[in-house]
């Protein structure tokens, strides 16, 4: 049954390469269509290939976490808070580096195995070049918040996931990380992700703001606001 679904999904993806009308399919979204074409033409990925994501060896994962230790420290409490706001909804909250490697994951212990089977574990490389269209990897390429819902994924093995991701930038506009909320539940609709996406965006902005303050903690910072009580001093 899974193989039949993967085969149908692969055929749907391949219609993009043929330039056929996809006005009613997942690729009717321009960002999805662009991503599917990148996966086919630039990365030469197979949408029907069902293998687990590449995982960094332990030493390299530790190095990656050390490079972003300050971001991980700042993001930890925000990720826990975000997970609590989504409590009971079957979500995993993930933080990756700028390459798409998962550096932290917050989820309910009872649901950890579900997300591990989906390939969402520490050290997994979810870059678009490796895993095709997905919340993390496509967010990195597009440099904007987005939701990838089920069949909008490139690989058939990922079509059980719904992922809402937001980029995290440093004070100089460089991509630092991606904050992602993923669900493996079938009942999750795309419309329901509007609320989730808003929460992810807010959390990503909070991480950016805290990182900005930490980065310039030895500098004078000027705050301006039309209302004095909103300056935050």
Give the residues covered by each predicted segment.
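A short beta-turn/loop motif at secondary-structure boundaries
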Residues: 153-157
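Intrinsically disordered, low-complexity terminal regulatory regions
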Residues: 1-127, 138, 144-147, 160-161, ...
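Tandem CBS (Bateman) regulatory domains
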Residues: 130-135
